[in-house]
């Protein structure tokens, strides 16, 4: 009962307030869609719940400026439609203000939207958020840089870098470019040599991949994506692959796709409120929510418990329109 009361206390009614909506016109789900009809459908969904809506559909180069303008306006709720990169930008900008963020799943992966149980069908997503509720969720950060999903070190930053180079050079789509980059990288699998400390003293690990997630992942058989059932546990998920060869890593990747990764004895998992990664290198590369970064070690990871107010579909079974209070 105490847990239920705490959860209720962290939730508030949703729309029915001044709302700014920014759409990335080039986001995957909008390609080939009549943008005027999409804009009208979003506006109507929120205005039916009493929201005062200002909506902009902008090109990718203008997204950051549009998000900043929305945050600096008198809007209480800022809704962003785009991929994980667009969402990552919005979170870093909105977090210091205490304003509410809403996410429309318009990208390829839509990881946070999935974990918030937001429908991926656009019409359903509009309605679910328009009648939604405000929740407080955790964010993770490393050396002051905020992320919502995961921070990945090891071979993966090299894969992402190769993928982007191939997309630019050969004009490949994202997934074919990713496949080619993965094959090239894991043939000569690089190992990360670091010491990690989560409060029990530093321990050396040599691994092809180290993942630090914002809240732990849950084993979900048959799921091709890593999922989180909780976004407010106050814990980081830490995952260290013990495999040091290509075939072992491929086996782990296969189990991840099948949703059976938790049964891999060569994957070490733990949870912690904070984690420090030490290295002899001057810089370490990582991929945070799809963005490649370089940082000087030590890397200081921590969780910021319930630091972000976010609009999410209702979870209490309330009827449509219940979130529309003034």
Label every model-predicted segment.
Residues 1-77, 88, 317, 326:
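ATP/NTP phosphate-donor binding region
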Residues 2-11, 198-200, 204, 230, ...:
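ATP/nucleoside-binding phosphotransfer catalytic cores, i.e., glycine-rich phosphate-binding loops
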Residues 26, 40-43, 48-49, 56-58, ...:
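Catalytic core of DAGKc-family lipid kinases
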Residues 80-85:
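N-terminal glycine-rich "phosphate-gripper" loop used for MgATP/nucleotide binding
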Residues 86-99:
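Short Gly/Thr/Asp-enriched flexible loops that form oxyanion-binding sites at enzyme active sites
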Residues 152, 211-227, 292:
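Glycine-rich phosphate/pyrophosphate-binding beta-alpha loops
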Residues 167-176, 218-220, 227-247:
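Gly/Ser/Thr-rich active-site loops/lids in small-molecule metabolic enzymes
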């Amino acid at each position: 009962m105490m847990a239920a009361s705490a959860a209720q206390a962290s939730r508030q009614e949703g729309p029915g307030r001044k709302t700014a909506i920014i759409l990335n016109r080039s986001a995957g789900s909008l390609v080939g869609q009549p943008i005027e009809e999409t804009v009208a459908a979003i506006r109507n969904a929120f205005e039916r719940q009493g929201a005062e809506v200002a909506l902009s559909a902008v090109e990718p180069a203008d997204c950051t400026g549009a998000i900043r303008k929305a945050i600096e306006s008198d809007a209480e709720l800022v809704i962003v439609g785009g991929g994980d990169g667009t969402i990552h930008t919005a979170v870093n900008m909105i977090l210091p203000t205490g304003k509410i963020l809403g996410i429309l799943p318009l990208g390829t992966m839509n990881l946070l939207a999935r974990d918030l149980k937001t429908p991926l069908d656009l019409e359903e997503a509009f309605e679910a958020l328009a009648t939604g509720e405000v929740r407080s969720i955790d964010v993770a950060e490393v050396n002051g840089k905020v992320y919502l999903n995961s921070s990945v070190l090891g071979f993966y930053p090299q894969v992402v870098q190769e993928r982007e180079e191939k997309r630019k050079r050969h004009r490949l789509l994202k997934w074919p470019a990713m496949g080619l980059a993965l094959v090239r990288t894991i043939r000569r699998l690089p190992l990360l040599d670091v010491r990690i400390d989560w409060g029990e003293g530093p321990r050396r690990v040599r691994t092809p991949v180290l993942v630090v997630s914002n809240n732990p992942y849950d084993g979900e058989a048959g799921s091709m994506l890593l999922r989180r059932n909780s976004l407010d546990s106050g814990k980081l998920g830490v995952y260290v692959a013990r495999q040091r060869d290509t075939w072992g890593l491929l086996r782990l990747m296969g189990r991840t796709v099948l949703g059976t990764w938790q049964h891999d004895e060569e994957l070490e998992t733990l949870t912690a409120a904070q984690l420090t990664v030490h290295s002899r290198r001057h810089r370490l590369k990582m991929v945070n929510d799809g963005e490649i970064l370089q940082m000087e070690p030590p890397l200081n990871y921590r969780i910021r418990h319930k630091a972000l107010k976010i609009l999410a579909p209702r979870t209490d079974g309330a009827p449509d329109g219940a979130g529309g209070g003034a």
